[in-house]
A protein has these predicted regions:
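Secretory/extracellular carbohydrate-interaction modules
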Residues: 1-74
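Surface-exposed coil/turn segments at beta-strand junctions on protein surfaces, enriched
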Residues: 2-4, 27, 91-95, 129
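Carbohydrate-binding surfaces in secreted/extracellular proteins
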Residues: 9-11, 92-126
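Surface-exposed loop/edge segments in extracytoplasmic proteins
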Residues: 43-44, 116-121, 158
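Hydrophobic residues embedded in beta-strands of well-ordered beta-sheets
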Residues: 55-58, 109, 143
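Short, aromatic/His-centered strand-loop micro-motif at the edge of beta-sheets
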Residues: 67-99
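Flexible glycan-contacting loops in extracellular carbohydrate-active proteins
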Residues: 121-149
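Activation corresponds to long, low-complexity, non-globular regions
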Residues: 157-168
Length: 168
């Protein structure tokens, strides 16, 4: 069973990147968010602030049993999770600063923007079994940020370091 995790990022949105890339699905999207229990590139929980084409917060569980790299799973295995309770996120414009925080305990996830809860729900028992570090994801968004994360209680040692390269 995964331990509780909490991650917070304070960021300033600077606008789109100079060069934009489509997602693996072919969709053009600008977004930024948090990874939780990131076992690897194929098995993790996302709390994503979609900037364009539509401003909203989306929580997804990406699960691909037996796959561990982006080359193995691509953009397969995503399941968007419906919240028990949700509220709108502000539309991001260049120059704005905000705080995005996610707290996951067992299969329950809470997401906050500027200390206001914007998403609360159950991500499922599959997500609760994932074990790995927190991180960030950014697609076509230019940001400056500070990431804060507490070491989960009861953990020893370090997780695998992030690697540069193509993501999905």
């Amino acid at each position: 069973m995964a331990t509780a995790q909490s991650v917070e990022v304070r960021f300033t949105y600077s606008g789109p990147t100079g060069k934009e890339a489509r997602l693996g699905s072919g969709e053009m999207r600008r977004q930024f968010g948090l990874k939780l229990h990131a076992q690897d590139a194929c098995n993790l929980v996302y709390a994503i602030w979609r900037i364009e084409p539509e401003s909203k917060l989306v929580v997804s569980v990406k699960r691909n049993l037996g796959a561990h790299s982006s080359a193995e799973c691509g953009n397969r295995g995503y399941q968007n999770i419906k919240p028990g309770k949700a509220s709108a996120v502000p539309r991001l414009t260049p120059g704005q600063s905000h705080t995005l925080r996610a707290e996951m305990k067992r299969d329950e996830l809470r997401v906050f923007v500027d200390n206001h809860e914007v998403w609360n729900g159950v991500v499922g028992s599959d997500a609760a079994t994932l074990a790995g570090p927190v991180g960030i994801r950014s697609d076509n968004a230019q940001l400056e940020f500070d990431l804060k994360a507490r070491k989960p209680e009861g953990t020893v040692g370090q997780g695998k370091p992030c690697k540069a390269g193509d993501s999905d």
